């Protein structure tokens, strides 16, 4: 496996065709100014979804590496994040409709490979389900899961509720955080079990004690996290689940090689390498 990923990573970097600019651009989508970056070139397009409240700035340290890949990469800030204008509706469905219009406008409609970090994992699953003919594979980087809160409550309701109250206070009604709480309450998203139907790579952080109080960072919390991630691809014969206790939740920053190798792994699944 290590040899295969190293070979694929070398192939991606070999003779790169660099196109586009690393400077953010702006498109008006449904009356909202949306910032995005479009770099690299190729027949395949990576589309990156960020975590809660995160915009383009989160990915800036990785742009030089991404621009060397033999693949086009599009990163954008959802409404209300980065320098994109705020919107009243930040639901998964509406956010994905805006993304679809952005991608169509810049002629990046086909052969898509979606990367979702944290909360962005919910977005890419829903997008792939809504546009299955366009999406070839998913890379989920320590992704949020709609059942995480309920499973933590099954383990220790008092601890889980105390921590949720603390987190709600820290997030101060951030719209996407509030949306995630609603998803936790519903315990479902409209993804049509897509992660069991197309090539998928999941990277899970099992690093303990990133915080010294949150139940999600406890031994049992991390086990629940791993198990939920595995459940997404339990019936997927063309999938990879990478688990590491050496990398925290911010996988792209904590372990750049793992991030780039996971991209290679996804492309390898699709290409049959």
Question: Model features per residue range: what roles?
Answer:
Residues 139-177:
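Flexible "cap/lid" loop of the alpha/beta hydrolase fold
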Residues 32-83:
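Conserved HGGG/HGGXW glycine-rich cap/lid loop of the alpha/beta-hydrolase fold
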Residues 109-147:
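Conserved hydrolase catalytic core segment
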Residues 14-16:
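N-terminal signal peptide c-region/cleavage motif recognized by signal peptidases
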Residues 20-33:
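N-terminal cap/lid segment of alpha/beta-hydrolase-fold proteins
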Residues 162-245:
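Conserved serine/cysteine hydrolase catalytic core
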Residues 75-115:
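Active-site loop/oxyanion-hole signature of alpha/beta-hydrolase fold enzymes
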Residues 239-273:
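Catalytic active-site module of serine/aspartate enzymes centered on a nucleophile-bearing elbow/loop
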């Amino acid at each position: 496996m290590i040899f295969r990923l190293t070979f694929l990573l070398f192939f991606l970097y070999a003779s790169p065709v660099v196109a586009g600019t690393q400077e953010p651009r702006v498109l008006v989508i449904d009356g909202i100014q949306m910032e995005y970056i479009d770099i690299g070139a190729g027949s395949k397009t990576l589309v990156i979804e960020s975590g809660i409240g995160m915009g383009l700035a989160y990915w800036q340290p990785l742009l030089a590496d991404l621009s060397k890949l033999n693949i086009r990469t599009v990163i954008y800030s959802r409404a209300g994040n980065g320098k994109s204008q705020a919107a009243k509706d930040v639901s998964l469905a509406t956010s994905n409709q805006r993304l679809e219009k952005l991608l169509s406008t810049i002629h990046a409609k086909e052969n898509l490979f979606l990367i979702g970090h944290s909360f962005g994992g919910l977005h890419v699953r829903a997008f792939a389900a809504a546009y299955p003919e366009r999406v070839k594979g998913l890379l989920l980087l320590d992704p949020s899961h709609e059942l995480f809160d309920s499973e933590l409550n099954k383990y220790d309701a008092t601890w889980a509720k105390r921590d949720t109250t603390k987190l709600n206070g820290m997030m101060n009604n951030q719209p996407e955080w509030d949306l995630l709480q609603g998803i936790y309450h519903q315990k479902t998203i409209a993804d049509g079990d897509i992660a069991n139907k197309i090539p998928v790579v999941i990277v899970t952080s099992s690093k303990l004690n990133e915080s010294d109080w949150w139940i999600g960072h406890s031994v049992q919390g991390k086990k629940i996290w791993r198990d939920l991630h595995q459940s997404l691809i339990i019936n997927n014969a063309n999938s990879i689940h990478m688990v590491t206790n050496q990398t925290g939740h911010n996988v792209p920053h904590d372990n750049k090689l793992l991030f780039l190798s996971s991209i290679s792994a996804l492309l390898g699944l699709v290409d049959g390498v």
